[in-house]
């Protein structure tokens, strides 16, 4: 049997982990079960990734990369700032509707990581990366269209992600396209207004 290098085995194990946990949940994602899913020895998982936490981190990175790649591909080349953001958000929402299992797995992994001290660093890194990627997309759209951002792109990105995560959870829990659309439209409108300095921020009294 031909030798398979760790570099070659890595994407295979990530896919096996995603397939298994999408089907059976994060709790089922032991290194033994993931190895069995791929048909390799359990030691192969540890040799390739070191720890289960490292594998989980790689799964989160892969799921995020796949979603971001799909969204970036939808960016229009000659549209205005609002139209560009709308197209990007529409593409991301399409992944929620068409690939709910991927978003559910990301949510489950995030909640699992909150309860697992050894995964907290991976979770923080994941959210930082998602925020940075979102901020970059906002920045690129603004620069291409000559739109001056009223707030830092990272602030706009965090606001958008907070709203989108909530809409995603609603859709996963109670799918209703008709009921969900106004919320999505309101989120995009608010993001555009925030980016353009047309959304007044109220003062929150300290507690």
Q: Where are each of the predicted segments found?
A:
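Hydrophobic alpha-helical connector segments
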Residues: 58, 72-102, 153-160
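Short, basic, alpha-helical segments at the C-terminal edge of helix-turn-helix-like DNA-binding modules
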Residues: 61-66
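Short, solvent-exposed amphipathic helices
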Residues: 122-129, 133
